[in-house]
Amino acid sequence: MCGITGMVTWQEDVARYQADLKRMQAVLSNRGPDQQGIYQDTHCAMAHTRLAVIDVERGKQPMTRQTATETYTLVYNGELYNTPELREELQKEGAVFTTHCDTEVVLQAYLHWGAACTERFNGIFAFAVWEQQAQRLFLARDRIGVKPLFYAEIPGGLVFASEIKALLQHPAVPHTIDKHGIAQILLLGPGRSAGCGVFQTIKEVKRAHCGYATETGIFLAPYWKLQAKPHTDNMEQTIEQVRELVKDAATRQMVSDVPIGTFLSGGLDSSLLSSLANQVLKNRGEVLHTFSVDYKDNDRYFQKSHFQPNSDPDYIRAMMDYLQCQHHWTVLDTPQLAAALIPAMQARDLPGMVDVDSSLYLFCGAIKEQVTVALSGECADELFGGYPWYRDPNIRERDGFPWAQSTDYRMQFLRDEFAEQIDGAVFVSQAYQETIQQADTLPEDSPLERRMRQMMLLNLDWFMQTLLDRK
């Protein structure tokens, strides 16, 4: 990951906020420990913290390119998986490249295609482009919402950043949460409504959205939407198509100029990805490094649940034997998990999933000692129906979020004066209804097919975003 942040002040010289920009950049240093950079002109200043993965020496940011009529400056966090194809297409249109990194491809794509460049990108990204002559800022976020991007309008301008904590470093962004923000945390958390930054003036660029900020306001719109289409393939064709898509996605994500490994829990998703990664690295003459986490005395105290019906270690060892990889174990105990609760929440900027977050926080720290990039099977359950609510009709047909049965328990944590202002059941129901009404369906869908399309969108916009927030 990398960190991006910046501000635009159309009515005054942005230089007066130089110290604020440096503070905003500093709190993002964990996202990008390798390099830092700052761009500044009269009305715009942007900063970047880089985790170098491709073209380590020449991929520095912010990155500026000029045409005969405009100067464009980019700050970018992400990875493009179709970089070679885009580079070739852009070169045919006259683009000249001086680096091998995807950052320059993003910038050249914007120079040639404008906002429509997002429709051509296969990847994960959040970026901003400042057009110096036009005095406008372009913001964009990937289709699924893997890379974060928040913003806040301030008097005469706008600030943006990869994380909420960076925005809060600016003096014009109040550290205020109103009753709507409280309801987001306590009634919908760890999820939150799309576009909501919880704090009173902070908003999120929604996934699959892009647009411009100008002196007259900010205008964002979707460039992609999940669409329902008739499925005409038979079972064998479907299996082959999914196999090729997964293989292609995994292979494209193995492009890196730094060490790369995989998470390995022994489950279907991580085992499949590790197998694919192993094949790619073997072809390069390299050995795959795999990583697993376990807990002290887990063999004594493990209790199965809907989410984890089996303990992992036996399956992990079976995959280790099959892959013949270089495996690394991280064993955590309860005091370690407890000590990491606050750092993990601070990294997320909002209350999260308690020990689920703290364990990942510690696990990733251990992984970084060996590799810079690691493939994970996270979100496979959301995309491929791995959760109980996809299969259990008693949960699936419930008129509400399948992972949240009642608001009564959560409402008891509100003080009386807040509880009187919020109808918890109505608030949660409205959030649920707003999501399922956006689900695209076909006229010929059966009730089950229609419900499964709704379930997919619920998972994409809510449960999955909770996991992606940790990216």
Regions from the PLM with identified roles:
Residues V8, H43, H48, P155, ...:
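Glycine-rich active-site loop/lid subdomains used to bind and stabilize high-energy intermediates
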Residues M1-A347, L360:
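Cysteine-centered catalytic environments shared across enzyme families
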